[in-house]
Amino acid sequence: MHLLLHGIDNARIEHGDALRSPHLVERGRLMRFDIVVGQLPFGRDEWRRDAAESDRFNRFWRGVPPKDRGDYAFISHMIETAVEARGRVGVIVPHGVLFRSGAEGRIRTQLIEDNLLDLVLGLPPSLLHHTPIPTAVLVFDKSRPRRPQPCTGDTPHATRASGGVLFIDASEDFEYGSPRNQLTEEQLSRIVRTYHNYQHVDRFARVVTAQELINNDCNLSIARYIDAHEHQSDVDPATLERDIATLETELARVRREMAQCLTALSDHTQR
């Protein structure tokens, strides 16, 4: 439907279950693509885990997700349909995908250790038509080096080459709307520019080393790595006391004036 609405009518469209029986297959193998994009089917609790354990395309070799959580099954499918050494994957996910443990945590760890994860982008709430919850975008890039070089004194900051992952927190950078919020062109440009530069931006973006992610059990919760809130600077106690004394003096003056006004008003009404 989205393709037709945007005037793209030369696409091959297949209707079916991509996990149980993918249709984009040639000569018994999954078709591969340079760009794979999608949005997880939120709220799908049952995805036929039993079929995945005997998957003929071996898409779940990093691990099989739990039967009541198919998110990483779709992510694994998308990654396996991206061209080796150059394919990229972009997927919209609920935040639980970033931090749930168990089988999902093990798959997430494997993706990080394979140096595939390129971006974790936090989006505002109520951005999508069908859900008010905040979501995130994960980008995987198969062109990243399989054996990243650790950060050294010459390159102290994390990069793609050293296995770094860019985190962007755009969850509070949006325009309120009804029934859904929106990202303006300026806000979108800021996200794209930050991703292109792949550098730290105060309270907005940070490149996190793979080792830090591993130390945090590969938890990708954005708030762990970016503090988007502006902190108050240290306050001098003596200055604070003077300010309070000044305000109290001003408050006493205002109260006296109010009492005088009320007295005058009372005298006037009694005449």
Task: Give the positions of each predicted feature.
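SAM-dependent nucleic-acid methyltransferase catalytic core
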Residues: 1-23
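A conserved structural/catalytic subdomain of Rossmann-like adenosyl-cofactor enzymes
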Residues: 15, 20-22, 27-271
